[in-house]
């Protein structure tokens, strides 16, 4: 089993063309569920499960979006940032390696382990297609402490008509992407050149993405984007896509757009500025932003 490959079956697959997640449901492990950690986060009790040496297992019914919220326990008053990682195995076949590095969040505490402190949360998202699925989380033997995990599942609903297309604050000219005879404007996002989007909430920001395929690339490929606000990383999103047979980039006939993949970001009340960046070197992603 390839432990570093991006998995084809956990692509950000939109079951409905315009959909958003409903309220999240906390998933409980089907095995190794006796061990748990209760953390106080912003005055609220939050239940986490440590990833066991034998692996932590979940049973999930799709279509749904899964959010993995992970934290790492550290020695009290340790100020430096701490790397940690874990593996996600979907349906016993596809595996993704997730890596985070965060500083200690001083406001987090534990009743069971008062001498420990905990990092800021690392958030990782996947979408699962319709049907029954299994998820297994595996830890790294070299880590001193087990990664604490909180797994949430969110269903989908229609986005509705109240939506607005946003443009990046600073950008090059938009590109016209022709799909099924319709022209849609996208904005290029490349490594080292993040886009900034200003949005006012309380709303949801949908980010539509298409990987730009060159002649040297294969029929399928993977890419990652990271969404942040200031220094806070809101989420890292992993996509797998393939060349679109029904779309083309009008200004770049020597390039082929991939099939679109998307993710959603919650926009709290007030004005916010989000950074969207591509994490894979030498890959260009075409983006479109919808606020609703």
Question: What residue spans do the PLM features occupy?
Answer:
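Short coil-to-beta strand junction motifs in C2/discoidin
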Residues: 78-86, 217-225
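Glycan-recognition and processing domains
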Residues: 24-63, 73-78, 99, 105, ...
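Short aromatic-centered micro-motifs
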Residues: 39, 88-89, 177, 227
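Extracellular and analogous surface-interaction loops
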Residues: 55-64, 125-131, 194-203, 264-270, ...
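Bacterial N-terminal signal peptides that target proteins for export
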Residues: 2-11
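Beta-strand-rich ligand-recognition modules
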Residues: 90-153, 229-291
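Bacterial N-terminal signal peptides
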Residues: 11-19
């Amino acid at each position: 089993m390839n432990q570093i490959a991006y998995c084809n079956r956990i692509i950000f697959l939109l079951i409905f063309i315009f959909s958003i997640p409903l309220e999240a449901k906390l998933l409980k492990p089907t095995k190794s569920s006796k061990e748990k950690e209760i953390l106080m986060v912003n005055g609220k009790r939050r239940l986490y499960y440590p990833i066991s040496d034998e692996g932590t297992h979940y049973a999930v019914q799709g279509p749904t979006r899964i959010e993995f919220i992970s934290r790492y326990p550290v020695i009290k008053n340790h100020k430096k940032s701490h790397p940690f990682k874990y593996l996600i195995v979907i349906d016993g076949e596809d595996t993704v390696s997730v890596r985070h590095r965060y500083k200690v969040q001083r406001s987090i505490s534990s009743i069971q382990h008062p001498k420990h402190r905990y990092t800021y949360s690392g958030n990782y998202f996947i979408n699962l297609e319709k049907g029954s699925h299994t998820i297994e989380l595996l830890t790294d033997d070299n880590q001193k402490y087990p990664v604490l995990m909180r797994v949430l599942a969110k269903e989908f609903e229609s986005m509705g008509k109240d939506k607005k297309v946003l443009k990046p604050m600073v950008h090059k000219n938009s590109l016209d992407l022709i799909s099924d005879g319709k022209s849609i404007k996208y904005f290029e996002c490349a490594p080292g050149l993040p886009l900034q989007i200003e949005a006012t909430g309380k709303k949801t920001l949908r980010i539509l993405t298409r990987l730009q395929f060159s002649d040297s690339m294969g029929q399928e490929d993977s890419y990652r984007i990271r969404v942040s606000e200031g220094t806070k990383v809101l989420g890292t999103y992993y996509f797998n896509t393939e060349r679109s047979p029904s779309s083309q980039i009008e200004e770049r006939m020597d390039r082929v757009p991939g099939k679109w993949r998307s993710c959603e970001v919650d926009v709290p009340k007030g004005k916010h500025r989000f950074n969207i960046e591509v994490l894979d070197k030498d890959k260009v992603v075409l983006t479109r932003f919808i606020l609703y």
